[in-house]
């Protein structure tokens, strides 16, 4: 995960259709909390993302990453929701906002 490029600022990619549908279907309060988290991430370096205890960036071992992607990661996007994403150079490419904790890890 962390490498010599850990001090590179994160560039968010929110253009995944599933991610957008999940995000915009959240209740207003939760949606605003998610947007606050995304705004926070946008100001961080990758090293800060890896160390941030609130985000809890962690590799998902129970879900196979698509071809060309090293790994899928989960991160806390609101107090009760986790999102999935992967790193692509400086980009954090968002994939989903899970309806519940277990579905983030492919258990449902």
Language-model region placement:
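Basic, Lys/Arg-enriched alpha-helical interface segments
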Residues: 1-81, 87-108
């Amino acid at each position: 995960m962390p490498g010599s490029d850990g001090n590179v600022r994160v560039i968010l990619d929110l253009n995944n259709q599933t991610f957008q549908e999940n995000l915009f279907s959240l209740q207003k309060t939760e949606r605003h909390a998610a947007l606050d988290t995304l705004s926070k991430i946008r100001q961080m370096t990758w090293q800060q993302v890896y160390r941030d205890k609130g985000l809890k960036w962690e590799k998902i071992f129970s879900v196979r990453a698509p071809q060309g992607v090293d790994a899928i990661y989960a991160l806390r996007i609101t107090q009760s929701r986790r999102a999935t994403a992967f790193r692509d150079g400086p980009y954090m490419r968002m994939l989903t906002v899970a309806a519940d904790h277990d579905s983030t890890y492919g258990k449902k």
